[in-house]
């Protein structure tokens, strides 16, 4: 029985992580080849259209300073709300990193009784669990900081007077899109952190969480209406 418990982590945890990695590779493949089939690509297209219309309306309004100011301020407030949400998640991720670091430094503390865990409960495995969880939160913090950086940059570009040329529109679109992509990457890091968190309860909950999460993410990441539109076009 000890032999089975010792190698249960190696089998189930590896299987759960492999399942998650393969799903995200499939999602990346779909995003590269046909971004509109994924929710991330579809939302990025909507944001590109939004930026284009914001700057186009600004150009058409011309010398009407009040209308132009209201239009730009609306765009800036939308981006600022995204920046605030990003910085909030970055702060939470950094705080959790600090908490985990203090927890690791205190060798006398235990997450919960090890007798409840069906799996490998050696000190080395517990250290690996902490390091994996800490790495996910550090990655999430890094991604959210990069997302906030691009959103702040798009604020500067959007508020630049006379920024209505095609080049200016593309710059704002790229900044907003990159901010959204890093936001999505930060959320993915938190999803992996949830899996590693359940690993503290044993390899079985971790593997089960990975499988359930993949099915939940699939329903969220892929658009059902894109399949219906494709079938209509073929028909």
Q: Can you say where each PLM-predicted feature lies in the sequence?
A:
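Juxtamembrane "helix exit" motif at the C-terminal ends of alpha-helical transmembrane segments
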Residues: 1-2, 94-118, 201-207, 213-218
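Juxtamembrane membrane-interface segments at transmembrane-helix boundaries in membrane proteins
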Residues: 1-8, 73-79, 113-134, 172-194
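Hydrophobic alpha-helical membrane-embedded segments
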Residues: 9-43, 87-103, 130-153
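Membrane-interface amphipathic/juxtamembrane segments adjacent to transmembrane helices
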Residues: 28-76
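Juxtamembrane inter-helical linkers in multi-pass membrane proteins
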Residues: 38-58, 117-118, 155-176
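Transmembrane alpha-helical segments and their cytosolic interface motifs
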Residues: 72-100, 181-207
